[in-house]
A protein has these predicted regions:
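Non-transmembrane amphipathic alpha-helical segments
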Residues: 121, 128-139, 160, 167
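A structural signal for alpha-helical segments
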Residues: 40, 67-70, 116, 144-155
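Charged, low-complexity intrinsically disordered regulatory/assembly segments
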Residues: 139-213
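Basic helix-turn-helix/winged-helix DNA-binding cores
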Residues: 1-97
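Amphipathic alpha-helical dimerization/coiled-coil segments
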Residues: 84-133
Length: 213
């Protein structure tokens, strides 16, 4: 996974649960199957958190939870600004053959206000349409290209059409108030055995420990 996308994923996952310890982040990301769609090596998650701390985008708090030492992470203002910038770029950059940045941004869409999500979807749709127009212009001179190259171009156009349909539908859903975005009351409840319940209790305890200094 590219460094920028790793930063986006780790910053976003910390923002969801902060304060949160490294084991919890690792477990949560693996429950998202990031090792498959994002090609994240589970062992790299801890080093990624350390790297972001060194960049000043995360703050590490070394606490004693009961009798157990634990390191928990929160995002800094620098980290939140970096997340917002990278999220917007990932949403608006169209690369049909390498959509990982876009997919990463979608996984973290609930961390973004509704108006900003709507703007990013509109910008991506405009960028996609511009790319299709360029591709159509290039196809006008492909009559002498090998057949398999023209077949590849047909595949790209098909991918673009499928994504365009999805973008239009999702844009309509966002404007209609659907989906759960930043600052809104969730419309779903996790299962009783969801680890998030334990993480929420840990979060409250970590906040108290941090406040004590």
């Amino acid at each position: 996974m590219a460094a920028t996308e790793t930063r986006l994923l780790l910053l976003g996952s910390v923002m969801i649960f902060e304060p949160v310890n490294g084991y919890q982040i690792r477990r949560e990301l693996l429950s998202w199957n990031v090792q498959e769609w994002a090609h994240v090596n589970p062992g790299s998650i801890y080093s990624g958190l350390a790297t972001l701390t060194g960049r000043g985008e995360l703050a590490r708090h070394d606490l004693v939870d009961g009798s157990r030492p634990v390191a928990v992470y929160t995002t800094t203002e620098t980290g939140r600004h970096a997340f917002a910038r990278m999220w917007r770029a990932a949403m608006e950059t169209v690369d049909l053959l390498s959509p990982l940045g876009f997919h990463t941004a979608l996984a973290l869409m609930a961390l973004v206000p509704r108006d900003e999500v709507a703007e990013a979807l509109s910008a991506r749709l405009a960028a996609l349409d511009a790319g299709v127009r360029r591709q159509l212009a290039e196809q006008g001179g492909m009559e002498h290209s090998p057949p398999h190259v023209r077949a590849m171009a047909d595949l790209w156009m098909g991918l673009a059409q499928t994504e365009r349909e999805w973008l239009v539908t999702t844009q309509q859903r966002v404007r209609a108030g659907e989906l759960d975005l930043l600052g809104e009351q969730p419309s779903w409840v996790p299962r009783d055995d969801d680890p998030g319940w334990v993480m929420a209790r840990d979060r409250a305890r970590y906040l108290e420990l941090i406040a004590r200094g």
